[in-house]
Design a protein with these regions (language model features):
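Bacterial Sec-dependent N-terminal signal peptides
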Residues: 1, 5-72
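Contiguous segments within soluble domain cores/interaction surfaces
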Residues: 63-86, 91, 97-98, 102-142, ...
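Surface-exposed, low-complexity/disordered segments
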Residues: 79-81, 98, 155-160, 169-247, ...
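Short beta-strand and strand-turn-strand segments in soluble, beta-rich domains
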Residues: 83-87, 128-137, 267-272, 355-361, ...
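Internal, hydrophobic beta-strand segments that form the core of beta-sheet-rich folds
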Residues: 107, 164-171, 390, 868-872
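Short beta-strand segments within Ig-like beta-sandwich modules, predominantly Fibronectin type-III
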Residues: 139-144, 276-281, 364-369, 565-570, ...
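Ligand-binding face of N-terminal immunoglobulin V-set domains in extracellular IgSF glycoproteins
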Residues: 150-153
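A short tyrosine-centered beta-strand micro-motif
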Residues: 163-167, 296-298, 387-389, 586
Length: 883
C-alpha cells in the first residue's frame, strides 16, 4: 500500500462518515489521524492535490505511475458531478390487466447515486409498447419533486398480449438503453360474462412483426453448451489465471433459460478431483480449487439430476493477471478481499476503486509485495446496494473487477391497518395509514398506494422499488423473483445474492469513461422544462446544416391561445426554445429565414424521436406464475386491524339534473366522422398504426416521407408489394388481395399514396367485415380490410416555403382514479367487478404522518385485500410494502 498519509489512510474516501442519501455532488474527505478536516481544509487540500496530479514529474519526462493513477482518481471522483445519472421506477396499480382496463401508474425519478428525488429533469417520458415494439401511447409528464403520474387506457387498439411499459428522462439516454425502466405486463381478453368462473385467454404472438427483436432467453452470458445444458463460468475478478487459485461462480440452465440442478467437478491433469460444488439457488453455484500451473489441462464434468455426466469447457486461462476472492462481511461488518497476483504484477503500483451507481466511494493505491494480499476495509467505504471493486494499472488497464453487495439502510416503515379482515359486497373499507418516525424523515414522505381484491390477482407481484433501484438496475438480463433476495438477511439469502451479482453482474457505467480514459459522449440535454430543439438542413442530398438562420415558432393551442418565440441557429445549425408549459396537443408552425431574411426551402428537424429501440422480451418474463394466496386462519390473524364504527350515512342524495341534447363539434365533421370515424376501424381491427407519429419521425430526421404501401410492407411482414403486368405495384396480405377503405368509405376519391396524407391505419382480418366489404362470392380471396384515415388537422394551415407545420405534445394532465361511493351518490350493484379497488398516486399525510382512507369493495360476496405501497423519502430512504 502507498497511502497519501503516514497513518495509511486512503487518498480519497467518499461518504464514509455521512448517512446514506447526501446531495448529488461529490464531497471529498481525506481521513487523517486527528479526525476529519474542516470543509475549507478539504477543498484547499483537494485543489492542491488535483493540481499536483496534472503536473508531470519533470519537464519532458513521462508521468510516473503515481501521476497516472492520480489522474484516474481525479476523473473518477468528478464523474458523478459531471455526468449525473437518474433512475426511474414506475409503480402500477395491478400486475395484469384485461382489455378495456386502465393502467394506473406513479413514477419516481431519483438520482442514481443516492436515490434522492431528482432536482435535475423536469420532464419524464412514459410509453406503452405492444408486442410489435410499436409505441401505442406516449405520455410526456411534468416531474415535480421527483414524482409524476398518469394512466394508459387499454382501448380498442390495445388487443390481448404482452405490453411493455417504459419510462425514462432525456439525459438517461446518454447511457446504455438497458438502464431505461422497463416492465412487461400481460393483457388478457375481457371475458364475455364477468363474475363467472374465470377463464383467462391471452392472445400473444410476440415474434409476428418486425419492429421488436425476437424474444430472447436469459441464458448465462458467455455460456457454453454441454449435453443440452447451458453452463456459464464466472471467475471472481473476471478471468482465470494460470498458477493462481480458482474462485468462480457458475450457472446451469436448459436451452430455454430454466435453471437446472447439477453438480460440477474439476479434475487435474493426473485425474485427481480438485474441486466439487453443487448448484444452490436458481441453478447458480460457486466452486473453489487450488492453483493449477495450466488450467487448460483441467477437465470439468457436469452431472445433472438424472445422473447424466457431460464434459464442460473452462474459460480460457491467462498467463498473467490477478484473482480476487470476496469474503462475506464478517461480524465487524468489514469488507475482505483476498487478492492473488502473478509475479510480474507483485511489485507494480496499482490502483483500487470502489464505485456505486456511478459514485466513487473509495480510491487508493496498492502494491502486492507478495503472492497474496488481504485488503480489509470498513463497510462504510462502500455505497449501499451493488458496488464494484476495480483493480487497475497506471495506464488504466483493468486487472480485476468484482461486484459485491452492501446492505442498505432499513426501509422507511409504513403501517396499514384495516377495519376488517375480509369484506362483503359493496361494503365500506377503511384503512389507517401511518409512518412511524415520520418526523425523522423531515416530514417529506411520498408514496403511492394500490389496494386490490386479492382474489382477482392473476400473476405474481412484480419487483418493488427496492428490488428495482438497488438490484435489478445493476444486473444483466432477467432476474427471477428478485424479492427472494430481500426476504431474509440470513447466510443462504446473502450467498444467493452474491452469486447473482457474479453471474448476472452488469456494469451500468463504463469504468474507462469514469476514469477519463474514454470520452463520454453527451447527446441528450437535461430538460428543465418544455424544451423544443432541433436542426435546420438545407434540403439537399448532402444534408448541410444552416447556421445563422432566424427561426420563429407559433404554438397554436386549442381555442384561441397562441404562444410565440424566436431564436437563431448556431454555427452547426442547431436551435432550441424553452416554451412555456402547456398541456395536451397543439400545432406548431415553424418559419425559417436565412441570413438575408429570405425564405428558402429547408428541412426543420426536431430532436424529439428519443425512444430507444424496442428490446426483446425475455422468455422468462412471459411465463405467467400465479400468486400464492394464503387464506388460512393464521394468515387472517396477521392482518393489522383496528376497531371502527360505521357512521357513514346510508341515504343516497340524488341531485336534480337537466338533460339536454348532446352536441358535437363539427369542425372536423364530414368525412372525418363518417360512420363513427376512427372508432369504427378500431372496433373491428386487430392492428393499429399511428401514422401521424411515423410521419413526424421521418421529418424530424430530415428524410423524405415514403409512400403509404411501401412503408406498410416494410413495417408489417404480412404485407408484400407485387409488381403487376402493367408495371405497377399491388399490395397483398399474406398472399391475398387487400380491400382499402378510406375514411370508412367517405374518401373514395382521395389520394393516399403518400404517408403524410394519413393520420392512422388499421388492419382488419375480421371475417364478417371482410364479407361485408368484398364482392359477392369473393371473400375467400381477400386477406384483410385496410382502413385508412386522413388527417384533418394538417388541412387547416397554408404551407409555405421555409415552414414546417407539425404537432406538438404538451404535458399529459393527470386523471383522477374513479371509485364508486355506495353511501352517497351511487346504488350498490351486482356488476361491480373492479379488481383495483383503490389507487392513489400520492397519499397525503397529516402533520403526524397519518392518513385515513375510505372506499368500497366490489360486488364479490367475500373478499380480502391486497395492499401495495411504493415510494421514497426526501433523504433517499425507500418505501415498500406488499401484503
Amino acid at each position: 500500500m502507498v497511502p497519501l498519509h503516514r497513518d495509511g489512510a486512503p487518498l480519497f474516501y467518499f461518504f464514509g462518515a455521512l448517512p446514506f442519501g447526501q446531495p448529488c455532488r461529490n464531497v471529498y474527505f481525506c481521513k487523517i489521524k486527528h479526525g476529519f478536516m474542516t470543509t475549507r481544509q478539504r477543498l484547499f487540500l483537494l485543489s492542491v492535490l488535483l493540481a499536483f496530479a496534472g503536473i508531470p514529474s519533470a519537464k519532458g519526462q513521462r508521468p510516473t505511475s503515481f501521476d497516472s493513477l492520480y489522474s484516474c482518481f481525479s476523473h473518477l471522483s468528478r464523474y458523478n458531478v459531471a455526468y449525473t445519472r437518474e433512475q426511474v421506477f414506475v409503480h402500477l396499480d395491478n400486475n395484469a390487466y384485461f382489455t378495456g382496463d386502465d393502467i394506473w401508474y406513479s413514477a419516481y425519478v431519483v438520482y442514481g447515486s443516492n436515490l434522492r428525488p431528482t432536482g435535475m429533469s423536469r420532464v419524464l417520458y412514459v410509453e406503452l409498447l405492444n408486442e410489435s415494439g410499436n409505441v401505442v401511447q406516449r405520455h410526456r409528464l411534468r416531474v415535480q419533486d421527483g414524482r409524476a403520474n398518469g394512466n394508459f387506457k387499454l382501448d380498442e387498439t390495445c388487443h390481448s398480449g404482452y405490453y411493455e411499459i417504459r419510462a425514462y428522462t432525456r439525459p438517461m439516454l446518454n447511457w446504455d438503453e438497458a438502464g431505461v425502466f422497463s416492465r412487461v405486463v400481460p393483457v388478457f381478453v375481457r371475458p364475455e360474462q364477468e363474475g363467472a368462473p374465470r377463464q383467462l385467454e391471452l392472445r400473444s404472438n410476440v415474434s409476428s412483426h418486425r419492429n421488436r427483436p425476437a424474444d430472447a432467453v436469459s441464458l448465462p452470458h458467455g455460456a457454453v453448451e454441454a449435453g443440452g445444458l447451458q453452463v456459464g463460468f464466472y471467475p471472481e475478478g473476471g478471468q482465470l489465471v494460470d498458477g493462481q487459485p480458482l474462485h468462480a461462480a457458475f450457472k446451469v440452465t436448459d436451452g430455454q433459460g430454466v435453471s437446472q440442478r447439477a453438480t460440477l467437478r474439476l479434475f487435474s491433469a493426473d485425474g485427481r478431483e480438485v474441486g466439487r460444488a453443487a448448484t444452490r439457488y436458481m441453478g447458480m453455484g460457486h466452486i473453489d480449487a487450488q492453483a493449477q500451473p495450466d488450467w487448460s489441462r483441467v477437465r470439468a464434468e457436469l452431472t445433472d439430476e438424472q445422473g447424466h455426466t457431460v464434459s464442460v469447457s473452462l474459460p480460457e486461462a491467462h498467463r498473467e493477471g490477478t484473482v480476487i476472492c470476496f469474503n462475506a462481511p464478517s461480524a465487524d461488518d468489514s469488507l475482505r478481499f483476498e487478492i492473488s497476483a502473478t509475479p510480474s504484477l507483485r511489485r507494480q503500483l496499482l490502483g483500487v476503486s470502489i464505485t456505486c451507481r456511478g459514485e466513487a466511494h473509495y480510491l487508493d493505491t496498492l502494491r502486492m509485495g507478495a503472492a497474496q494480499k488481504m485488503l480489509t476495509l470498513p463497510a462504510d467505504y462502500a455505497g449501499q446496494g451493488v458496488n464494484e471493486l476495480t483493480l487497475f494499472t497506471p495506464d488504466g488497464r483493468i486487472l480485476a473487477e468484482r461486484l459485491f453487495w452492501r446492505e442498505p439502510d432499513s426501509l422507511a416503515r409504513v403501517d396499514v391497518r384495516q377495519n376488517r379482515a375480509h369484506y362483503g359486497a359493496c361494503s365500506p373499507v377503511v384503512l389507517k395509514v401511518s409512518v412511524p418516525r415520520y418526523e425523522d424523515y423531515g416530514s417529506n414522505v411520498r408514496f403511492s398506494m394500490a389496494v386490490r381484491e386479492a382474489g382477482s390477482d392473476i400473476v405474481r407481484r412484480a419487483p418493488g422499488i427496492r428490488e428495482q433501484l438497488l438490484l435489478s438496475s445493476s444486473v444483466r438480463g432477467y432476474v427471477e423473483r428478485p424479492e427472494y433476495y430481500f426476504e431474509s438477511a440470513d447466510s443462504a439469502h446473502r450467498a444467493a445474492l452474491d452469486l447473482l451479482l457474479q453471474v448476472q453482474g452488469w456494469r451500468s457505467h463504463n469504468w474507462q469513461q469514469m476514469a477519463g480514459l474514454e470520452p463520454m459522449r453527451v447527446r441528450h440535454p437535461v430538460e428543465e422544462g418544455m424544451l423544443i430543439d432541433g436542426t435546420i438542413y438545407d434540403g439537399s442530398s448532402r444534408r448541410r446544416t444552416c447556421p445563422d438562420y432566424s427561426l420563429s415558432v407559433r404554438i397554436v393551442l386549442p381555442g384561441s391561445n397562441q404562444l410565440k418565440g424566436e431564436t437563431r441557429t448556431d454555427s452547426l445549425g442547431n436551435f432550441s426554445f424553452m416554451a412555456p408549459s402547456f398541456y395536451g396537443p397543439a400545432m406548431g408552425v415553424f418559419s425559417a429565414r436565412n441570413a438575408r431574411d429570405k425564405r428558402k426551402y429547408c428541412i426543420i428537424s426536431l430532436h424529439r424521436n428519443l425512444a430507444p429501440q424496442p428490446r426483446a422480451y425475455w422468455k422468462q418474463e412471459l411465463r405467467l406464475v400465479p400468486p400464492q394466496l394464503d387464506y388460512t386462519a393464521a394468515r387472517l390473524t396477521e392482518t393489522p386491524l383496528f376497531s371502527w364504527q360505521d357512521t357513514i350515512r346510508t341515504d343516497i342524495q340524488l341531485r336534480e339534473v337537466t338533460v339536454s341534447e348532446k352536441g358535437y363539434d363539427d369542425y372536423y365533421g364530414g368525412r372525418y366522422t363518417w360512420m363513427g370515424g376512427e372508432e369504427y376501424g378500431k372496433k373491428y381491427s386487430e392492428t393499429y398504426y399511428n401514422v401521424a407519429d411515423e410521419v413526424e419521425q421521418y421529418m424530424d430526421q430530415g428524410f423524405d416521407v415514403p409512400g403509404t404501401y411501401e412503408w406498410l410492407a416494410e413495417k408489417d411482414r404480412r404485407f408484400t408489394l407485387d409488381v403487376t403486368p402493367e408495371g405497377g405495384e399491388r399490395l397483398r396480405f399474406m398472399g391475398k388481395q387487400v380491400i382499402t377503405v378510406v375514411d370508412n368509405g367517405a374518401g373514395k376519391l382521395l389520394s393516399v399514396d403518400r404517408l403524410d396524407d394519413l393520420r392512422s391505419m388499421m388492419v382488419c382480418t375480421d371475417a364478417a367485415e371482410i364479407s361485408r366489404r368484398a364482392p359477392v362470392g369473393q371473400s375467400h380471396r381477400i386477406g384483410c380490410v385496410l382502413f385508412l384515415y386522413t388527417d384533418p388537422a394538417m388541412n387547416i394551415f397554408d404551407h409555405r416555403k421555409g415552414e414546417r407545420i407539425t404537432r406538438l405534445e404538451g404535458y399529459r394532465a393527470p386523471v383522477e382514479f374513479y371509485s364508486p361511493n355506495y353511501r352517497k351518490t351511487e346504488m350498490p350493484t351486482t356488476t361491480d367487478f373492479r379488481r383495483t379497488l383503490y389507487w392513489n398516486p400520492d397519499v397525503e399525510l397529516d402533520s403526524r404522518g397519518e392518513a385515513t382512507l375510505t372506499f368500497y369493495s366490489n360486488s364479490q360476496p367475500t373478499q380480502r385485500l391486497a395492499v401495495s405501497v411504493q415510494g421514497f423519502t426526501a433523504d433517499g430512504h425507500l418505501i415498500e410494502l406488499e401484503r
